[in-house]
């Protein structure tokens, strides 16, 4: 088979940070690229006014909800992710941080590469492409977090977040449109940030540097084809070559239709899984169990991490309060060496997440905390009910996104659950993840009392002892052998050729910070190992020519 028999050189599953970077760099190297994305393409004018419009916010196609925000519930954790052209960048909080250096000495990837020497250049390129800068707009939530830090003696740790936002020039109001400010005029026109707080509900001002404005934009400009609302249902090696050395046959269908699945088959030379940590794990489990890719490492699904995360906050009642102004995450403090707290907000009117929050009760995780929660309802029914009312939640609430570097993980498996025996579903196993972070809860209660607010947590934490996370990592970890991970130090799937994993599932340790920048930098690194197409063709020609000469010598 020759390369001309393929529909594409590379087929990429997913258009998030890993997929968009891969598409951009591969098209630059001359390859033909297809990107399969389950979600829809969104423009600034398409986003809903607020997140009460569930049909345009939640992604649940089986219920005819075609938004971009996905929430998946497991026994051990509730995971938030994004489904859209541009992946999680459409709905993430726009925060891009470099993790501490020690993470490269930990986990499965420690001996897979010389990370500390290699990664700085890739972080720098990722920051350049994503337009990362210090937050320049401090809203009331940021000023309040600074006061809180000072009140408990950690004010010196307060700092602005690093965000991918196009801010207005000093002294100018946001909302003005400019020609591309990042790529010498080669990129799209951009609008400046208005500090509306709507980063996580879709930026309506073209100020958020989502992937469709940088990596994916240039990938399409260079010829990549993005197939939206398309789900990959099968990937199997071509021509009976079990290791994929001849490429793969990929079957796709429509992700948004109940009945008209629009099945289609593609012949491709290489496949890159970039479907998010959960999406890639689930897909590889199904392909392994169905026999399409049976030699995927048995380590698949192991050590899924969450940044040891917790969502807390303080709610301030009153008409004059407005914590919604600013970027989604504008500042942070460290309350101790391991515990990082970020000031987080939603746009005014986007109060739907308030349904997931409740009054913070004292006590340790488990039934005693439920008892204290019910006792609070009896003792303070008026405050309790106000805390449970989502109306004005975004304006009144300073949300704390708490993260730690503590290494805790669960395992994912594809199996039949007792309550749904009709098909296999992705399920969590292992020890409980840390939910109750004592120092973070103590800080929240203390500053709430000091600043006349009320401490808040999530209802899943109180009732089910289950944490929330937007940072699902691992499950297809980078490692030096298939006994310890799923991909090698260059993101190549063990036991296969021409098969890669480039997304959050590749992370081999707990980062302790928002992972998007690290995923981007690792994707840059993975693509740097793939030579330009013309180089491969020259090598193939030389090899064929040499083989012909050798054959001629033998026959002579």
Swiss-Prot record:
Co-factor(s): FAD
Xref: InterPro entries: 4Fe4S_Fe-S-bd, Cholesterol_Oxidase, FAD/NAD-bd_sf, GMC_OxRtase_C
Keyword Transport listed: no
Pathway where this protein functions: Steroid metabolism; cholesterol degradation
Positions contributing to FAD binding: 18, 37, 88, 93, 235, 504
Record field: catalytic activity: cholesterol + O2 = cholest-5-en-3-one + H2O2; cholest-5-en-3-one = cholest-4-en-3-one
The enzyme's E.C. designation: 1.1.3.6, 5.3.3.1
Biological process terms in GO annotation: cholesterol metabolic process
Keywords noted in UniProt: Cholesterol metabolism, FAD, Flavoprotein, Isomerase, Lipid metabolism, Oxidoreductase, Steroid metabolism, Sterol metabolism
Gene3D superfamilies: FAD/NAD(P)-binding domain
Active site, per annotation: 471 (proton acceptor)
One GO molecular-function entry: cholesterol oxidase activity
Physiological role: Bifunctional enzyme that catalyzes the oxidation and isomerization of cholesterol to cholestenone (cholest-4-en-3-one), an initial step in the cholesterol degradation process.
Family: Belongs to the GMC oxidoreductase family.
Protein name: Cholesterol oxidase
């Amino acid at each position: 088979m020759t390369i001309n028999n393929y529909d594409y050189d590379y087929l990429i599953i997913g258009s998030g940070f890993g997929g968009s970077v891969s598409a951009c760099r591969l098209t630059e190297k001359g390859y033909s690229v297809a990107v399969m994305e389950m979600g829809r393409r969104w423009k600034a004018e398409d986003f809903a006014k607020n997140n009460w419009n569930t049909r345009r916010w939640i992604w649940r196609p089986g219920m005819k909800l075609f938004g971009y925000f996905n929430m998946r519930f497991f026994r051990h954790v509730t995971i938030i992710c994004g489904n859209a052209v541009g992946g999680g960048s459409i709905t993430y909080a726009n925060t891009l941080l470099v993790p501490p250096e020690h993470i490269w000495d930990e986990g499965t990837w420690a001996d897979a590469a010389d990370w500390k020497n290699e990664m700085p250049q890739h972080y720098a390129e990722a920051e350049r492409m994503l337009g990362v800068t210090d937050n320049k707009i401090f809203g009331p939530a940021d000023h309040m977090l600074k006061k809180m830090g000072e009140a408990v003696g950690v004010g010196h740790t307060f700092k602005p977040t690093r965000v991918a936002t196009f801010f207005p020039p000093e002294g100018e109001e946001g909302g003005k449109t400019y020609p591309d400010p990042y790529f010498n005029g080669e990129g799209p026109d951009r609008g400046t940030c208005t500090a509306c707080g709507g980063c996580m509900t879709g930026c309506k001002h073209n100020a958020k540097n989502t992937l469709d404005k940088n990596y994916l934009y240039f990938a399409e400009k260079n010829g990549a084809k993005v197939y939206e609302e398309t789900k990959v249902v099968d990937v199997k090696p071509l021509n009976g070559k079990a290791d994929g050395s001849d490429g793969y046959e990929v079957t796709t269908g429509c992700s948004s239709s109940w009945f008209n699945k629009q099945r289609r088959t593609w012949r491709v030379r290489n496949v890159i899984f970039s479907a998010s940590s959960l999406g890639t794990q689930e897909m590889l489990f199904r392909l392994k169990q169905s026999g399409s890719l049976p030699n995927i490492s048995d380590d698949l699904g192991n050590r899924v991490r969450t940044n040891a995360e917790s969502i807390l906050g303080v709610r301030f009642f009153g008409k004059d309060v407005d914590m919604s102004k600013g970027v989604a995450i504008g500042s942070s403090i460290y309350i101790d060496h391991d515990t990082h707290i970020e000031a987080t907000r939603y746009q005014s009117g986007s109060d739907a997440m308030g349904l997931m929050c409740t009054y913070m009760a004292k006590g340790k995780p488990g039934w005693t905390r439920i008892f204290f929660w019910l006792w609070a309802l009896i003792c303070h029914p008026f405050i309790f009910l106000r805390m449970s009312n989502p109306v004005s939640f975004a304006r009144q609430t300073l949300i704390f996104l708490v993260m730690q570097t503590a290494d805790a993980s669960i395992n994912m498996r594809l199996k039949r659950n007792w309550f749904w025996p009709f098909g296999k579903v992705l399920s969590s196993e292992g020890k409980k993840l840390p939910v109750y972070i004592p120092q973070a809860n103590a800080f929240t209660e203390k500053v709430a009392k000091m600043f006349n607010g009320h401490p808040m947590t999530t209802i899943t934490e109180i009732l089910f002892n289950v944490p929330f996370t937007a940072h699902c990592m691992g499950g297809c970890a980078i490692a030096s052998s298939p006994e310890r991970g799923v991909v090698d130090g260059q993101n190549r799937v063990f036991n296969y050729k021409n098969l890669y994993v480039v997304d959050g599932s590749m992370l081999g340790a707990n980062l302790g910070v928002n992972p998007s920048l690290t995923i981007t930098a690792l994707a840059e690194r993975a693509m740097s190992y793939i030579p330009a197409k013309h180089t491969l063709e020259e090598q193939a020609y030389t090899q064929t020519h040499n083989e012909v000469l050798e054959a001629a010598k033998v026959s002579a």
